[in-house]
Swiss-Prot record:
One of its GO terms (biological process) is translation. CDD domains: Ribosomal_S15p_S13e. PANTHER family: RIBOSOMAL PROTEIN S15P/S13E (PTHR11885), SMALL RIBOSOMAL SUBUNIT PROTEIN US15 (PTHR11885:SF6). This is Small ribosomal subunit protein uS15. Part of the 30S ribosomal subunit. PROSITE patterns: RIBOSOMAL_S15 (PS00362). GO terms for cellular component: cytosolic small ribosomal subunit. Belongs to the universal ribosomal protein uS15 family. Residues 1-18 have a biased composition (Basic residues). GO terms for molecular function: small ribosomal subunit rRNA binding; structural constituent of ribosome. It comes from Pyrococcus furiosus (strain ATCC 43587 / DSM 3638 / JCM 8422 / Vc1).
Length: 158
């Protein structure tokens, strides 16, 4: 499949092995995993970093291999665990990381206004932000009146 803002295909990467149940060597229960996720979030880690720590230090390859105790038809996710405990960020993390990139690029362009390649990169990043905002408004993760504004984005990122 082609990239979003390029006409070429990406490099192939490794594929996760197809599993429906946790491996035998995982000795943690669902409650222990939830407690670990909450503990790591309170220490200030992002959801991606929590997943990496669970994989590398605790031997849990993926939280999605475990069934959600509240709804057995769904699998657990780190975001659902954080929402259940009231620790989820108000702005979704992928959107926040894109906003952070845009703010840093704007800061660069203030010092180097003739950097046209970076200007184009900023346009592409802000297109992705607008696309994600539209999606999150439709899903109800963001309020309907939320708008991306570069000036208020500086205050969001800090």
């Amino acid at each position: 499949m082609a990239r979003m803002h390029a006409r070429k295909r990406g490099k192939s990467g490794s594929k996760r092995p197809p599993r429906t149940a946790p491996p035998i060597w995982v000795e943690y229960t669902v409650e222990e995993i939830e407690n670990l996720v909450v503990k790591l979030r309170k220490e200030g880690y992002s959801t991606a970093m929590i997943g990496t720590i669970l994989r590398d230090q605790y031997g849990i390859p993926s939280v999605k291999l475990f069934k959600d105790p509240d709804n057995p038809n769904r699998n657990l996710t780190i975001t659902r665990i954080l929402e259940k405990h009231g620790l989820a960020p108000e702005i979704p993390e992928d959107l926040m990381f894109l906003i952070r990139r845009a703010v840093n690029l704007r800061k660069h362009l203030e010092q180097h206004p003739k950097d046209l390649h970076s200007m184009r990169g900023l346009q592409l990043i802000e297109s992705k932000i607008r696309r994600l905002v539209k999606y999150y408004k439709r899903k109800g993760k963001l309020p309907k009146n939320w708008r991306y504004d570069p000036e208020t984005a500086k205050l969001l990122v800090r």
